């Protein structure tokens, strides 16, 4: 991978971390099954997503930190960052460029996937 490619991946990773950790730079979406949980449970799930750091080749093959999963009270929770065009109609042509990308972080049960 060229230095330019590495720089792009580093930018994508940073932008994904900003959204996941601080809610900056995109939308956070919860599926119905997550929204149906208590406020306390939702807060606990958000904290687990925010502090998630178990990234490895199996769940992060491109080093973008765009996916994670964990167990919560016997259920598997999954979160995923997706990249869209600014009008949200198509995929983003360049997820490293904020002017060309609208990010969403979706938090869901594995069974919602």
Where do the protein language model's features map onto the residues?
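Compact soluble domain cores
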Residues: 7-70
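Short, compact, well-ordered microdomains
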Residues: 66-113
């Amino acid at each position: 991978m060229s230095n330019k490619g590495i720089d792009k991946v580093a930018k994508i990773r940073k932008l994904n971390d900003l959204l996941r950790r601080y809610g900056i730079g995109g939308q956070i979406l919860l599926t119905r099954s997550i929204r149906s949980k208590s406020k306390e449970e939702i807060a606990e799930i958000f904290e687990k997503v925010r502090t998630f750091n178990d990234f490895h080749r199996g769940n992060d093959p491109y080093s973008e930190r765009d996916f994670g999963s964990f167990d919560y009270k016997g259920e598997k929770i999954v979160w995923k960052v997706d990249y869209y065009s600014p009008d949200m109609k198509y995929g983003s042509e360049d997820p490293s460029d904020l002017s060309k990308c609208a990010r969403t972080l979706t938090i869901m049960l594995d069974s919602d996937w």
